[in-house]
């Protein structure tokens, strides 16, 4: 895809930009800076930019079935958040084993459950990064009623939480293992089945967050690889997009037609000459993406 299709939207200077989510209601993309405990909003129509600060790392965001109400994953727990008033209320889920481990990437499934992975905690109380390692990570599913279940164990850095357009395949990654896997997903009871290797040892950076398009292709961001790859359902590489920064972290589709791929990046490793590291980027795509799944609010 031509470089002309890529532009820097916000030079946010994020230490670790993550978890972009498109909100159709206000025509905005929201995303986080994990290390600075921030949530950003960029409104596309008037190009306004807003930021909120939280009391610990903000690792993932999800819209809910109640307009204006978000689920926010912090390093240690989940909270409900209403951006218009900045009201914040504990969800009830607290990560077992924190602060040895922390939460990381997460999203809602087609049934309204929230899936989120954990990892060994590599963040100091002030947000500075330390080295990550181990296989302490767990993939959790939290139901609308608040029931918690474990579905994958032994993860290094849990990343990528995506579903195929028909909901029948779940994609997830372990950054430390340089692996993206595809699981069969039962849309009746939100359980995982057989696992297959999907993108293993690709060689250009390591797998971070991803986005799914309407054709069933997974766009995987490559931390340290300076780009994103579009991967067909059979695991073959369909397209490679280069960015002028090395550490690409996550992506989501947005815009009125869902044909803009918003991409987050990280400045925390201070690569020489990367003045736009930590920016939010936008890539014009021919194939639209999927609208975000919503966390279901229990009656």
Segments from the language model and where they lie:
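Short loop/turn segments immediately following beta-strands, especially the blade-tip
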Residues: 183-190, 284-290
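Residue position within the beta-strands of beta-propeller blades
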Residues: 30-32, 72, 115-117, 171-173, ...
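Short, conserved, GDST-rich strand-edge loop motifs in beta-rich repeat architectures
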Residues: 116-134, 266-277
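A short beta-strand motif characteristic of beta-propeller blades
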Residues: 5-11, 47-53, 89-96, 147-153, ...
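Beta-rich, blade/repeat-based domains predominating
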Residues: 12-26, 55-71, 97-113, 120, ...
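Loop/turn-rich, solvent-exposed surfaces of beta-rich toroidal or solenoidal domains
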Residues: 178-179, 183, 199-236
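A short loop-to-beta-strand structural motif that recurs across blades of beta-propeller domains
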Residues: 38-40, 77, 137-140, 179-181, ...
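Blade-level signature of beta-propeller repeat domains, shared across WD40, Kelch, NHL, RCC1
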Residues: 252-299
């Amino acid at each position: 895809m031509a470089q002309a299709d890529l532009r820097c939207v916000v030079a946010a200077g994020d230490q670790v930009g993550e978890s972009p989510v498109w909100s159709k209601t206000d025509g905005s993309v929201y995303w986080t800076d994990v290390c600075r405990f921030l949530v950003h909003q960029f409104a596309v129509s008037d190009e306004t930019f807003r930021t909120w600060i939280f009391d610990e790392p903000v690792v993932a965001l999800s819209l809910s079935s109640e307009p204006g109400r978000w689920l926010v994953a912090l390093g240690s727990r989940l909270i409900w958040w209403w951006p218009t008033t900045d009201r914040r209320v504990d969800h009830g889920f607290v990560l077992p084993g924190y602060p040895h481990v922390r939460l990381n990437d997460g999203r809602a499934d087609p049934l309204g459950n929230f899936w989120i992975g954990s990892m060994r905690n590599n963040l100091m109380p002030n947000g500075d990064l330390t080295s990550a390692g181990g296989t302490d990570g767990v993939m959790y599913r939290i139901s609308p009623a608040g029931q918690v279940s474990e579905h994958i164990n032994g993860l290094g850095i849990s990343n990528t939480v995506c579903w195929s357009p028909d909901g029948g395949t779940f994609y997830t990654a372990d950054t430390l293992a340089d692996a993206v896997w595809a699981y069969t997903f039962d849309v009746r009871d939100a359980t995982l089945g057989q696992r297959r290797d999907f993108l293993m040892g690709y060689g250009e950076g390591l797998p971070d967050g991803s986005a799914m398009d309407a054709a069933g292709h997974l766009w995987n961001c490559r931390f340290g690889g300076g780009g994103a790859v579009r991967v067909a359902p059979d695991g073959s590489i369909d397209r490679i997009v280069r960015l002028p920064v090395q550490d690409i972290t996550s992506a989501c589709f947005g815009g009125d037609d869902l044909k803009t791929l918003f991409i987050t990046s990280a400045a925390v490793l201070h690569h020489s000459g990367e003045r736009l590291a930590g920016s939010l980027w936008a890539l014009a795509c021919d194939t639209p993406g999927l609208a975000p799944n919503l966390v279901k609010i229990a009656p």
